[in-house]
Amino acid sequence: MIVINMTMKYFLFILIFFSAFSCMEPNNENLWNLNKIAGIDTEGYCRDVYVSGDSVFVAAGQAGIQLWDISTITSPRLVWKRSLSDLGLNKEISQVEYKSSIRQLFALESNERPIHIDLSIPDSVNVLGQFSSEKTKEFRVKTNNTNSFTVYAADNDDGLKSSTFEYDSFYKLWFNTSGNEISSIGNPNGIDIISDLIVLTLDQLGIQAFQYENSIINSLYHIDLPGNARAITISDTDEYYVACEDEGAFKIVSNYPDHAPVKMQFGEDLYVTHVAISSNQIALSCAANGISLYDRISNDNIESRGIHNIGYVYHAEFYNNYLFAASREGLQIFQID
């Protein structure tokens, strides 16, 4: 039989008391604050955002496409909007991308084909139509010069697709002059590009890298990852961040072709759909869990700086020291402290 005297009872009570309060009030000194600067009611779910100067292009889901002016960041002003019927589409808009050098806007009808919109004439929104193939999950646009661009698409059926357009000054039209289709080892659902490097996410099969050289696209390597590789953000030619849904996120240093890739997992207890990075700041889009912030302390150390429940977040982007969050609650603009 164990006898607990009054002194032992006292110390046991103190231990339980402080343990309880340490759980109730965690140490917040290393957490970052999200200060909300502005919120935009996008009518439909805000699925994606692309910022160019004072212009913010919004993929507003069932509400179509919108352009907002943020020259006064605390009071965004709607410049124009186009509904699905205006665009001649049926499904929600899931992505937007704008190229200021050629004043062309591109959007994606969810799981369908990209759409091309000409904004080169002031106060005019000229819908030029859709191109490439159905089952496009995501795309990237690369300008070749002021009269040419190439769209690279992650096609969930056929792999990596490219479509090159050139402007004919006589007809004043953009013509699709060439295209290519490169098979991948799995069905792509995400893409990113830097320089001549193209990387696809392949759901349960990780990622696959390609190189564009002398008008030819060749497969370079494949990296397997746990979970479902959903989206990729390339920060450098050999450093990538991959959102892997239930497995959180991975930082990958490829080391190609000399060494095996180095993988660092973080946010593994979260459901991650996208990774945004700016210098040492990392923002994970975590669907119903909002935004999770991380600090890239060093090449091999990434530390959590807190989870912020701001609603259901699809995608986030850093721009000019602001964080733009595309969410079901609309577009939200923050500063990190």
Region spans (language model):
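Feature marking well-ordered beta-strand scaffolds used for ligand recognition
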Residues: 23-337
